[in-house]
Amino acid sequence: MALSAAIVLAAGEGTRMRSNKPKVLHTFAGKTFLNRVMDSVAALNPDTLAVVVHFQAERVAEAARSYDEQVTIVNQDDIPGTGRAVQCAMAQLTESGKIDGPVLIAASDMPLLDSETLHRLVEFHTASGNGATVLTTILDDPTGYGRIIRDREGNVLRIVEQKDANRSELAVQEVNTSVYVFEASVLAEAIAGLKSNNAQGEFYLTDALETAKSAGKVGAFAAPDPLTVEGVNDRVQLAALSKTYNRRVCERWMRNGVTILDPETTWIEDDVRIGRDATILPGSFLQGHTVIGEDAVVGPYTTLIDATVDEGAVVERSRVQESHIGARTNIGPWTYLRVGNEFGEDAKAGAFVEMKKTHIGNGTKVPHLSYVGDARLGDHTNIGGGTITANYDGVHKNRTVIGDGCHVGAGNLFVAPVEVGDNVTTGAGSVVRHAVPDDTMVYSENTQHNVEGWKPAWER
């Protein structure tokens, strides 16, 4: 199946989103609308992939290039409409070389448009010998969509936009999805004669189908799953589609052996991976490339972003980002793990602990009320409550190293850079500024002063 070109339409503002950014840069299940559609289109390996931009053109172009450096960016001029967008794209593509064969055109506001549906559309188009083929679907409520008007034999006559449709046309439930395949020669002829004779004063790409009938057969292929071609025009639709899709994602994981107690409050993005017999408790958000091992327990009320949680680990009421939680390690409740933490096995970070860029050894515990940053903690070390690694000197982040088998007292302060050996014990309230050798007890002498008869200022 050779695809000469694919054109992604991303020029619109999306005014109903009421947003300061283009609609195509809003996210759905962890990816922008634009990137999701580009994913699906690119899977068909078109000879050329083009993205048409206009509103906040540079911003959208940058997002497209970050996905594919080789993408062709087409700037639509101030003449409105999808038909004009395709005119601009074809003019630029034909300048670069001959376009000969099927051309796929897709809107970029359908976040669930999948490569399988597109593949079947192109196959149907080619097998039917069509000059043009439109991807359609049947909706119980077709409000807002262009209607597919057929003749008595079922051939596609035209597509009528909602604002231009009469009463009988509005009753039609088969709708246009804004995805098409044209033969390049048919498309070139069809878009050449487009006019703006409509309520919006735009160049509609849908009008090209009527012209295409004179140059070749026009057909329609119905998407097997209406959800894959459902568009998003406002935030209400975005929320509804997100909820429906997330329910499907949760059901898929449950059928694969994962316990999800409340799918309504559990959100799982596409690139997440979960092992068998893991349990996801209510209020959990699993994002990015998070990986959860077998028998792990996540939640309730936990956010994992690009995190790895090994088998048997527990992460409760916590936020974890780009960190690795070792097997049978316990995190939480109310733990904040910033980027770059690496936990060994059977370790612990407890209540109101914050960590970043720290290695935590096997069996090591930081139970509560501590900040540990830019540090390395050895195996089987216990960190007392209220311990702080003072890692920032105002210019640089400095490293703290605490060895194996250490017992750190409550309320300790480690002034980095500092290194503490193995089997060291520190007294409560110690301030450790200098290196401590192995097998040492260290404490700070802080003299206590009692001022008798003291009264606070407001009582004097």
UniProtKB/Swiss-Prot annotation:
**A Pfam family that the UniProt record links to this protein:** Hexapep
| Cofactor or coenzyme needed | Mg(2+)
List every stretch annotated N-acetyltransferase: 257-460
- What's the Enzyme Commission number for this chain? 2.7.7.23, 2.3.1.157
Instruction: Name the catalysed reactions.
Output: alpha-D-glucosamine 1-phosphate + acetyl-CoA = N-acetyl-alpha-D-glucosamine 1-phosphate + CoA + H(+); N-acetyl-alpha-D-glucosamine 1-phosphate + UTP + H(+) = UDP-N-acetyl-alpha-D-glucosamine + diphosphate
Q: Where is this region: Linker?
A: 236-256
GO BP terms, alphabetized: cell morphogenesis; cell wall organization; lipid A biosynthetic process; peptidoglycan biosynthetic process; regulation of cell shape; UDP-N-acetylglucosamine biosynthetic process
> What residues does acetyl-CoA bind to?
391-392, 428
- The positions annotated for binding Mg(2+) are 109, 233
Against CDD domains, the record matches this protein to: GT2_GlmU_N_bac, LbH_GlmU_C
- A Gene Ontology molecular-function term? glucosamine-1-phosphate N-acetyltransferase activity
Give the pathway: Nucleotide-sugar biosynthesis; UDP-N-acetyl-alpha-D-glucosamine biosynthesis; N-acetyl-alpha-D-glucosamine 1-phosphate from alpha-D-glucosamine 6-phosphate (route II): step 2/2; Nucleotide-sugar biosynthesis; UDP-N-acetyl-alpha-D-glucosamine biosynthesis; UDP-N-acetyl-alpha-D-glucosamine from N-acetyl-alpha-D-glucosamine 1-phosphate: step 1/1; Bacterial outer membrane biogenesis; LPS lipid A biosynthesis
Cofactor comment text = Binds 1 Mg(2+) ion per subunit.
Name its cellular compartments. Answer: Cytoplasm
UniProt main location, coarse:
cytoplasm
- Which parts of the sequence bind UDP-N-acetyl-alpha-D-glucosamine? 9-12, 23, 76, 81-82, 146, 161, 176, 233, 338, 356, 371, 382
Q: Where is the signal peptide?
A: none
Q: Where is the active site?
A: 368 (proton acceptor)
**Chain spans, region Pyrophosphorylase:** 1-235
Any GO CC annotation of this UniProt entry: cytoplasm
Provide the assembly information: Homotrimer.
Protein name, UniProt field:
Bifunctional protein GlmU
